[in-house]
């Protein structure tokens, strides 16, 4: 595998995006590009993102569309359409990664598999502290996170420990649950086979689960990324979930349609 494309979704939180990008800039593995996928932010976030385009140690591109509510799947499709890598890593702009994040995902990548990683949630109070002090969590030793866990500033600890696991990474090949696009690795060719995210999922909810279900229907299997590629997820208030029930109903209808693979309104509309 050569170039990896890291697609960072963001919306109106420049302070979080700064922390996310800074953690990507110190990666041990430099053979990747960053695509900032902006879901309609205002000028402040836009200027922050554009500023980093000139400061990044790796290739960094920025794509933005009009704010018409939560359309993360749409902006991710647009980002994939312009990316140059053969492997995709989806993360959110309110996530902080460790210095070996790219390297470990590269080690886990295997043809015919997608790789969901795990996340460690920060408390609301500690998130505020991290942002105000601009803490470089990616540079902290494991002892620091043990202390955070004891103080209940993070919700779990064991995700930070690397375990080889071996064949245990393959024991649930068709599991779609808890595979989220805040930390998900997919071969670009597999993403294109299923036509990416289905933009019929409007508003918050289940567009990532739908993607994974269609990957499984297409014969792409799950390789577990837990205990290898954790991310730190900053606390934020919940998104508007007014469309959640509609999206969930659509997801359940598709779950048992094993021949439903290709998104009805997907990435193909942005590719010549």
Task: Describe each region flagged by the PLM.
Residues 22-31:
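Short, acidic, metal-binding catalytic loop of nucleotide-sugar glycosyltransferases
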Residues 100-149:
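Conserved donor NDP-sugar-binding/catalytic core segment of glycosyltransferases
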Residues 2-5, 33, 210:
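Cell-envelope/extracellular polymer assembly enzymes that use nucleotide-activated donors
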Residues 18, 43-52, 100:
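Acidic helix N-cap motif at the loop->helix transition within catalytic regions
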């Amino acid at each position: 595998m050569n170039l990896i494309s890291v697609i960072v979704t963001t919306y109106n939180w420049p302070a979080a995006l700064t922390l996310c990008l800074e953690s990507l800039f110190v990666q041990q593995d430099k053979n990747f590009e960053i695509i900032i996928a902006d879901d309609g932010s205002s000028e402040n976030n836009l200027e922050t993102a554009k500023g980093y385009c000139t400061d990044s140690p790796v290739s960094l591109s920025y794509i933005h569309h009009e704010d018409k509510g939560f359309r993360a799947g749409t902006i991710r499709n647009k980002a994939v359409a312009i990316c140059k890598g053969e492997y995709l890593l989806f993360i959110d702009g309110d996530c902080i990664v460790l210095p070996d994040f790219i390297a470990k995902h590269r080690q886990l990548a295997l043809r015919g598999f997608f790789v969901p990683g795990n996340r460690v949630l920060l408390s609301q109070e500690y998130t505020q502290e991290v942002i105000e002090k601009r803490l470089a969590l990616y540079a902290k030793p494991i002892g620091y996170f043990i202390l955070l866990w004891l103080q209940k500033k993070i919700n779990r600890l064991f995700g930070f420990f690397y375990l080889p696991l071996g064949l245990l990474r393959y024991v649930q090949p068709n599991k779609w649950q808890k595979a989220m696009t805040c930390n998900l690795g997919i071969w670009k060719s597999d993403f294109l086979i299923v036509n990416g995210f289905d933009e019929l999922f409007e508003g918050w909810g289940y567009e990532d689960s739908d993607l994974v279900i269609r990957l499984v229907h297409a014969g792409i299997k799950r390789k577990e990324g837990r205990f290898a590629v954790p991310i730190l997820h900053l606390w934020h208030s919940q998104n508007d979930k007014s469309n959640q029930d509609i999206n969930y109903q659509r997801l359940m209808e598709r779950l048992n349609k094993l021949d439903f693979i290709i998104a009805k309104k997907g990435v193909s509309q942005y590719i010549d």
